[in-house]
């Protein structure tokens, strides 16, 4: 298991690589190019510059999150082929820079969706939260305004202004698009890009929908075990993988998250995992919590056990953290609580390793980065 940390770059992040270096056990950075419009080719020189910055601090850059998919591809428009060709070239360029895993999603229009970016918890921390009634009572444009006003001036992943300024025309285009249509459009995309990923030694890793149900009447398909199983069998290749996100899938209590992890780990289709916790309320609303099992509705210990039992050799990162200790940062992506999350996840992992190896007298943790 390779522990990583998402970083938004010098221009977009309050968290520095020097601070990340001080978190024990972090080996790599999960990064992206945020100045390239969705659908355009990522230039190799820009990728190499990001890699240089990351390598300079002793980290690897082997996971990219995300190379977003243009809406024309999701809609199945005739113009999709141009954007698919651009996507292929981006895969090739990332592979040349040593990238092994590309995370992406196939959610129409919106990426992750929340009603609140700073809901106050009983302990005084603030978290991302989803209240169904709030979402149902506002139109998409109002939600965009609320998200932007609550973002503390930061660019939020999946909420790129150049895409969202065309919100009304996009909703018109999606009128009548069904889940089956979206499955067909994803299949077309995968049939084109997976062979390129295979040639380049890259694994594509689809992120589940967040939350895993329809929002504003838009179709969503990466929502449960059955649908994800259908997706990985569309193109039966190890390069057609998943980013299993416990918090996204776990927002629906019908999803048995440890079982989902075990199922796809057995298939060898999990190159990347996001592990975080959520607290689900009786009415179906949810809010994010610390990573600790007893603080939310998910059994994080059992999820980590599933990864350990599978001898997971892929990449993992903590996900959305609380805002704690007065930190001012991008909602969900501060330093402190994600660092606490890492130590919790590594503590579980070390305990499992110790149980496995206690008769062998081996040490259970790897050394921190030395530069």
Swiss-Prot record:
Domain of life, per lineage: Bacteria
Signal sequence, renumbered to the chain: none
UniProt keyword ATP-binding present: no
Matching Gene3D superfamilies: Divalent-metal-dependent TIM barrel enzymes
Organism expressing this protein natively: Geobacillus stearothermophilus
Cofactor needs: Fe(2+); Mn(2+)
Listed PANTHER family: MANNONATE DEHYDRATASE (PTHR30387:SF2)
Broadest EC class assigned to this enzyme: lyase
Substrates-to-products reaction catalysed: D-mannonate = 2-dehydro-3-deoxy-D-gluconate + H2O
Pfam assignment, any one: UxuA
Protein's UniProt name: Mannonate dehydratase
